[in-house]
């Protein structure tokens, strides 16, 4: 008689209550170790590794080419699905716990992998996957990768420059949009296109 239970809403309520009431424990290593660990990538995997290693007392430095911590949590997932503040408070917890972030640092271009190996006792590679699988279909000139579209939309939402959005290439306003796929990423594209004012949005799914 009480209707459905929205698990996501319950989990969010519990999590928000924990943060508000101070139940989320700070990172406090039981022992400080002298060994340093370099982590390449500040996305979900890199952040998880940083927390686990720092909790065990290692000195952790996370390198990322972007200017914000979070990877696809920040740039790939729309704000209506995951608020950026959720990622930012996790980042602050890591910083308060002693994790160091080196942002705008492109490994290989700005610092060599050999230098990282020489600087740290170990290096964790947590770069994620940003390259899309091409469709390779005839006349695919108007096809854009979902991640490119979502990243541009997120950058606009963050107040960053997004040339491909400004030029109209990755702006769905007044466009007839077709999204191929029916997974989470496809739904993010559908909802983003609608919010941008697309003339129509059609989802093709097998």
Annotate each PLM feature.
Residues 1-2:
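Local cysteine-cluster metal-coordination motifs and their immediate loop/turn environment
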Residues 5:
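Charged, alpha-helix-enriched surfaces in structured cytosolic catalytic cores
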Residues 11-206:
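Residues forming the flavin
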């Amino acid at each position: 008689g009480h209707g459905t239970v929205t698990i996501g809403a319950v989990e969010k309520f519990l999590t928000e209550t924990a943060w508000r009431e101070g139940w989320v424990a700070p990172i406090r290593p039981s022992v400080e170790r002298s060994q340093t660990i370099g982590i390449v990538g500040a996305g979900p995997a890199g952040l998880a590794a940083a927390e686990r290693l720092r909790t065990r007392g290692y000195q952790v430095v996370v390198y990322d080419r972007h200017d914000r911590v979070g990877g696809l949590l920040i740039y790939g997932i729309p704000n209506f699905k995951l608020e950026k503040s959720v990622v930012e408070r996790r980042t602050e917890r890591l910083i308060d716990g002693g994790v160091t972030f080196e942002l705008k640092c492109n490994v290989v271009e700005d610092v060599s992998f050999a230098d990282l190996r020489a600087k740290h006792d170990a290096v964790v590679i947590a770069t994620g996957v940003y390259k899309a699988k091409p469709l390779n279909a005839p006349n695919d000139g108007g096809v854009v990768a979902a991640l490119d579209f979502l990243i541009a939309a997120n950058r606009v939402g963050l107040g960053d420059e997004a040339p491909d959005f400004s030029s109209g290439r990755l702006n769905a306003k007044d466009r007839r949009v077709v999204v191929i796929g029916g997974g989470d990423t496809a739904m993010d594209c559908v909802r983003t296109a609608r919010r941008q004012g697309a003339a129509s949005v059609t989802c093709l799914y097998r």
